């Protein structure tokens, strides 16, 4: 049979499986590819192919992640699955595999377990917009009342972490039944029902080009007779020649006009998400702009110094610290293109943070940075990465 070509004309969405160890995340991932392969929407990927996930580096941290792709009638999906709990923590915090939504896998035989709770909390902290639940191993539970009890527990746990627990779709089934062609109601049909719920409930992400313009400043040049040019890669949105923009971060916000956009030495009318451009700024002096600031649509991003973050601290083996740190720890925080010193305040009751921990903490930077929720950063000591984090919420 000829391999069906993936058509790229469907909207794209990034999702992943999360949940406690051995609750069936990888089996479910395999089962989805098996069931969707029947309609040519996937290539069946067996459990052991997914389980030996390759290692990859993200922000100086090694993470094992398996990627599969498949499509439903409505969407094309890129799906990530991680072999170990630590990989999930690192993946979600670094944003290595960005998730527009996630499938929370809970074993009906065990109910919610510690990592179930931790993954829901992480999803909340790092800003995963929506979750759908797959209650797995339902073929191991004979008592329908017990299933209802587990479902109630899961809904309560989701609500506790500010997800809409009462509204989140929960699909009951068995990934193993789907893989072994047993009990079609719990196997094959449940997988199709799950994908229908994912299609309907996980919102379509806004494409980067449709978001407000933002470009981190990488370099600044002055060109005699023309003015100041700043270079960088447009992170999102579009900037047109003649538009007003703001320069945000490190100092007071300034307004200016983009009088030219060039790429590969050619003049353009506009630059858009993904382009490496030089932007000519009207009336801006070379010393008024620096690396670490951003150019953005006026009013879209504000500079901040205090925020709450979720961070993962590297182990010694990963090249991180050898010793714990305490409150008032002062590393550098690398945002987009530059390091800024900040002071860490640990939560009440947390004495210290050991290498390998993930932790919610408060950070006070010594200078403001253009910042919004979900922004990723690295924690560094003298240029060496010792951790990774994400802005969970802004204080001021």
Curated annotation (Swiss-Prot):
GO cellular component terms listed in the entry, alphabetical order: cytosol
Residues binding Mg(2+), per UniProt: 26
EC number of the protein: 3.6.5.3
Main subcellular localisation: cytoplasm
GO MF, any single term: GTPase activity
Region (G5): 174-176
Subcellular location: Cytoplasm
Chain positions covered by the region annotation G4: 136-139
SUPFAM superfamilies: EF-Tu/eEF-1alpha/eIF2-gamma C-terminal domain, P-loop containing nucleoside triphosphate hydrolases, Translation proteins
Annotated spans, G2: 60-64
Catalysed reaction equations from the record: GTP + H2O = GDP + phosphate + H(+)
Keywords of the record: Cytoplasm, Elongation factor, GTP-binding, Hydrolase, Magnesium, Metal-binding, Nucleotide-binding, Protein biosynthesis
A Pfam family this chain is assigned to: GTP_EFTU_D3
Binding site for GTP: 19-26, 81-85, 136-139
Region (G3): 81-84
PROSITE patterns reported for this sequence: G_TR_1, G_TR_2
Domain tr-type G: 10-206
Region annotation G1: where it falls in the sequence: 19-26
Annotated PANTHER family: ELONGATION FACTOR TU, MITOCHONDRIAL (PTHR43721:SF22), ELONGATION FACTOR TU-RELATED (PTHR43721)
Role played: GTP hydrolase that promotes the GTP-dependent binding of aminoacyl-tRNA to the A-site of ribosomes during protein biosynthesis.
Self-association state and partner proteins as the record states: Monomer.
Family indicated by similarity: Belongs to the TRAFAC class translation factor GTPase superfamily. Classic translation factor GTPase family. EF-Tu/EF-1A subfamily.
Protein name according to UniProt: Elongation factor Tu
